[in-house]
Amino acid sequence: MVKPRQRQYPTVTSYLNIVRESLFITISGVFWMYCIVVMIVYIGTLINSQMESVITIRIALNVENTEIYKLFGWMSLFVLIIFIFFTFSLAFQKYKKGRDI
């Protein structure tokens, strides 16, 4: 009869491909730098900043102040619609659950 002993769990050995991982980190870093630059430009435009770097980047991206204001207007409208939809959905769900009890 076999004596009981601790189980041996298989270990997973993984060798990361250094080229693939470095390429992934580089692409991710470039993406995050672009996102930070765009956020700086949008925030600078929304607070009506006259910093030279914000104006230069806005000219390089070919974006006007009115376009950014329109974009945030549309975004706020959609956020409001989604907020109202989810609020009514939650209220209806609570009402239906209370009625079933």
From Swiss-Prot:
InterPro entries per the UniProt record, alphabetical: IcaD (IPR020510)
UniProtKB keywords: Cell membrane, Membrane, Transmembrane, Transmembrane helix
Membrane topology: Multi-pass membrane protein
Keyword Transit peptide among UniProt keywords: no
Subcellular localization, as worded in the UniProt entry: Cell membrane
Keyword Protein biosynthesis appears in the UniProt entry: no
Consequences of knocking out this gene: Loss of cell aggregation and PIA production.
GO cellular component: plasma membrane
Transmembrane stretches, start-end: 21-43, 71-93
Function (record text): Necessary for the synthesis of poly-beta-1,6-N-acetyl-D-glucosamine (PNAG, also referred to as PIA), a biofilm adhesin polysaccharide. Is required for full IcaA N-acetylglucosaminyltransferase activity.
Designated name of the protein: Poly-beta-1,6-N-acetyl-D-glucosamine synthesis protein IcaD
Highest classification ranks of the organism: Bacteria, Bacillati, Bacillota, Bacilli, Bacillales
